[in-house]
Amino acid sequence: MVGNQIIGGMIRKAGGFSFQELNLTVDDIASMSKGGAYLSYDFITRPAYHHAVLTGNTEFLRLMLRTVHEYGIDPASLIHALQNHDELTLELVHFWTLHASTPYTFHGQTLPGAVLREHIRETMYENLSGEHAPYNLRFVTNGIACTSASVAAAALGLRDLTVLTDADIERIKRVHLLMVMFNAFQPGVVAVSGWDLVGALPLPAEAVAERMVDGDTRWIQRGAYDLADVAPDTPVSAEGVPRAVALYGSLTQQLADPASFASRLKHMFSVRQAYGIAASRQLPIPDVLTPSLLIMMHELPAGRGIQITALNFVPDPLEEIIVLEHVPPGPVVDMLN
């Protein structure tokens, strides 16, 4: 902790900028936010929003969002990310160490943190790997090697990625966009990888067998991609990594199509920037009646009003009345349309 604060202070004195990506308890992330790195990687809600995608239930996600508030962490100080070069970690350190005995309410039961952790992990492993999704692989004992697109495929119950139809790809894209919206329509930094932009699928394990001899299954999620169609017919990168199947195509192709994944992202990010959502202040997370619903409310900068992010984690339409306390009446604007 002290080392983090010293390094952060030295970087600030040099006019630099820093962030830390240690997978820590919420207690430690809160402590580091006071005098340490400017930003912390959001290991708090990252496993939780994937859990919501896979189960269609936002209860654990709401629990973790409220935990952020409980510990006085400003969501604007977090880097909310989609896929990166590492596995989707399911370590859930917060419930493993300091809060193994702390009671939590989940699905109507009171569970110690250690039991809640194992329940979440078992659900994630079952839904995101093994028989249900054989294209994703466990990484050692605390995570799963996967891509954002393969998370979406698993959530949709698609077992064989070699026989995807155009309709399947469109459904994967919609789930992928849901994940982007959760991360982008809240305060803080949103991080999207090149693998996300092209809709990369995991490589077959045999394609990177030599790189996985030490058990590092993460190589299946690190397939090569070509954002600008520089070498569209090249099957292997200059470093010898096989090209991943890109469900959405290159950026060059996508930006010519207003309905493509990248074009939809471009629109989302323009809305995020226009309204100053990154610098907004998140209000308490409301209760909901429908398990698949998540509501986040944000006070926009410069008194521009209250922004509401309403996300449905299942494909079925829903209707619910939410009472917004302490929100002044005013005109309602659909920011995306």
Please state what every model-predicted region is:
Residues 16-21, 297-300, 305, 322:
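Catalytic cores of nucleotide-enabled group-transfer and carboxylate-activating enzymes in metabolic
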Residues 72, 78-79, 83-307, 313-317:
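Loop/helix patches that line or flank the sugar-binding groove of alpha-linked glycan CAZymes
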Residues 12-21, 190-194, 276-283, 330-334:
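Acidic/polar loop patches that form or flank catalytic/metal-binding clefts of enzymes
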Residues 313-337:
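C-terminal beta-sandwich/jelly-roll accessory domains of carbohydrate-active enzymes
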Residues 1-82, 93-108, 199-231:
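Active-site-proximal helices and loops of the catalytic beta/alpha 8
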Residues 49-51, 303-306, 337:
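Short, surface-exposed beta-strand/loop "edge" segments at domain boundaries and coil↔beta transitions
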